[in-house]
């Protein structure tokens, strides 16, 4: 590459040779010509020694009368000041007595045509955005798959603590586990300008991890490293990978952020493996997955009672079971267990964003402490600004309070971080806000992109119904039921839709199915309320809502603006229930 056309990147800096411009984190620095010329010469021969005599010839012609020694020393001193470097403990430029100088930091050299394309390509994508693709399991034992997935998620979690980075969430990156698309296409789909990919090979007490960071627009390798370590070093490896990514993307980290990234979740490797396996079960997002995750999470805290992240995850699993209306035990017992686990997690670690986030969800979903929940969400997002789930749940709180613009802002931020798996929340809250046309457009898009996801067909069904396409809406709700035959949530919504369409016979048949199911297992009274509301039986519907309130079952916190209970809003008993929930 011609010297005069080069673009050099090192640490947070970028030097553009053609325009003679030096940038730090995207901000142009003022620099005199001589220090800039020296920096260009050193970067062009990164790692090599450039003698003082070579620099003299570069800066001053033989005919120029100047105190060369003083002039060069002054220029080097200015340069170190610009880079915040030290002669005694150099990070960028090393002095070799009687020999010269050399650059000791990794330098990336980019062709300007590629840089221009990258700039054009990423005009709407933040420069510091990264998606961590699932690490490939190269171990002989296929059961180590959960271990590789755990490393993927932990690196994402570390990066999500950095305010200056946009980090795509686990749920979205896991859809590309099979690598059936090119890196550039994956980056476009995820809205990320860079991708981290890697592999994990575990053998006995040793682990080999290979990681590389790639620019989606240019296919340039921004950073790569191989770690051959003892398994006990796994946490140090994860931290190092996260910090190296931050450096490569020129992300500025505060002291507190760096400290949080370096914190070990547990000193017990076996507890960590149990936790990782439980996390894999949790991410199935099914009743069985939540219940099985609890077994592994509890086994993890049995080994290490101080494992705060595992306690927060126990709280999360119980909470998801309660809100979904399928708890495997009484809602009261599950809620008590969730609260106890969340409280214990915070007692262990007050700076764990996940613990504040799940505590916030418990505060508003079960205690109706809206102000306390909002404070907890704000703290969670301060500690983990890249948490899609915290933004998502905060959006639920705002929507429950009728703050629809704020809710949509949070949910759209969540979707930026989790572009694959959070389309339906936006549709739901557009419907709650009465923005039917926008909701229908979003719903159709989500159903096209995720045809196998029941919730996508559920929200599409309601968007169609409110748009006047009743038959198409019911067909979409039937599709949701077919995709998730065990979920009473979708069945009960279908019952309401049938009742509203005048098919009372079918609505009552669905009501009977729910009754029959409730004889064998717990069915949330919240789901019965859907059907009764559709049938116009207001008192029966409110009876069920009051039972759901008493037992904190289902998504009772969202009833104020729910479009499924719109015909109950003027009922005195419904208004009384809202007052009991601090929603009047």
Where on the chain are the PLM-derived regions?
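C-terminal non-catalytic interaction modules
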Residues: 543-584
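The N-cap/first-turn positions of alpha helices
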Residues: 35-38, 79, 525
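Pre-signature/interface helix of ABC/ABC-like ATPase nucleotide-binding domains
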Residues: 27-29, 94, 557, 566
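Acidic, proline/glycine-rich low-complexity intrinsically disordered segments
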Residues: 5-9, 16-17, 21-30, 34-74, ...
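Sterile Alpha Motif
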Residues: 526-551
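Intrinsically disordered, low-complexity glycine/proline-rich and charged
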Residues: 73-75, 80-116
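Amphipathic alpha-helical protein-interaction segments enriched in hydrophobic
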Residues: 488-493, 521-533, 557-558
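Hydrophobic patch in the ABC ATPase nucleotide-binding domain
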Residues: 85, 192, 574
